[in-house]
């Protein structure tokens, strides 16, 4: 659905909700350190290489990406990612850049797959890979172009999840099993909301990375998007469909927060950066997500229902519900209970969702 536009059938949706809701709802500052030596990584040389890459990107008009440039921050992130002292699941790090965090993870004994789309960084990463005995695997690819919605042969750095997981040696496990893979990365500022939506669609439909189980995401995202993910009912601007779906689908944990993550930026970078905070957030899919009436086969319908309900978040609800209750006042679990009630009802069918909307909902806002 396009932002600011009510989806078709909103009036019918309101009548449907009124009938269905009656029985349901009564009741530190990172720094760039050059010259500090780490085993297997020449930080000063990495800094020089990073500066050269940034200059090439500036000349070519390509947006400069953000990387972890501070060894102290890298150690903090490593501690956030490492749970306990026992064996750790494989970790996929996308867009590692100069590899400062990569080296820190390796030093901690974590097995890492580095997925890098910038050819300028591959030689250093591959050199590090060759110096180790299988602890690091380097793959050319772009996580943000994983399983693109196109037909035909993919052109690198676009990558297919099936090929990626085969290369990593990660097999599919049952949904309620332990986490088979952890992923870390910094979400690009451009199209950040769209990328989060794509991940949520994959989660609910058990597609892409989620075909292999409850893959854990550890992402640096903007503080604005984190506030949306953790919003509470009634919060005017923050409580959105993304909020409801993320809170139902995932356990959301704030691991760390930094004021500035990327130091080598354009002179006018502050003109387009939305704020100066990034939040490291862990998104772990819920084990009990697909219990009751919610299943991967009807999850798209559920997503659209939530978007439909919150298209006009101030719409009033009636019928044995408090007078001032509005769509944005319902808790995420209320939406799930409503959907499950509709699924179990012989009165309502999915025809009111409109076939054309179901066909396009995967790509709108993605």
Predicted features by range, described:
Residues 216, 307, 325:
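Short, flexible active-site loop motifs that bind/organize anionic cofactors or intermediates
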């Amino acid at each position: 659905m396009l932002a600011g536009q009510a989806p078709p059938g909103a009036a019918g949706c309101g009548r449907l909700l009124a009938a269905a809701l009656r029985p349901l709802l009564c009741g530190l500052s990172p720094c760039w350190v050059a010259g500090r030596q780490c085993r297997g990584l020449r930080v000063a040389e990495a800094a020089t290489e990073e500066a050269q890459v940034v200059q090439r990107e500036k000349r070519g008009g390509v947006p400069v990406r953000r990387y972890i440039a501070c060894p102290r921050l890298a150690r903090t992130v490593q501690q956030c990612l490492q749970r306990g002292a026992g064996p750790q699941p494989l970790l996929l790090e996308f867009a590692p850049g100069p590899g400062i965090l990569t080296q820190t993870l390796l030093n901690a004994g974590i097995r890492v797959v580095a997925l890098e789309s910038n050819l300028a960084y591959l030689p250093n990463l591959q050199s590090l890979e060759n110096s180790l005995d299988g602890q690091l695997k380097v793959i050319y690819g772009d996580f943000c172009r994983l399983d693109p919605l196109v037909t035909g042969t993919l052109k690198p750095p676009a990558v297919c999840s099936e090929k990626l997981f085969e290369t990593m040696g990660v097999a599919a496990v049952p949904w309620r099993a332990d986490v088979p893979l952890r992923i870390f990365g910094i979400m690009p500022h451009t199209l950040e909301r769209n990328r989060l939506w794509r991940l949520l669609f994959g989660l609910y439909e058990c597609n892409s990375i989620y075909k292999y189980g409850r893959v854990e995401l550890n992402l640096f995202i903007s503080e604005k998007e984190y506030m949306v993910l953790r919003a509470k009912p009634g919060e005017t601007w923050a409580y959105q469909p993304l909020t409801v779906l993320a809170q139902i689908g995932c356990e959301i944990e704030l691991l760390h927060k930094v004021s500035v993550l990327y130091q080598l930026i354009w002179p006018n970078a502050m003109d387009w950066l939305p704020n100066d905070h990034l939040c490291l957030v862990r998104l772990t899919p819920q084990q009990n997500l697909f219990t009751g009436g919610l299943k991967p086969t009807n999850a798209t319908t559920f997503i659209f229902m939530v978007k439909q309900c919150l298209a006009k978040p101030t719409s009033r609800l009636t019928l044995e519900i408090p007078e001032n209750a509005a769509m944005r006042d319902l808790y995420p679990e209320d939406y799930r209970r409503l959907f499950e009630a509709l699924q179990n009802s012989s009165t309502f069918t999915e025809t009111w969702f409109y076939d054309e909307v179901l066909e396009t909902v995967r790509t709108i806002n993605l």
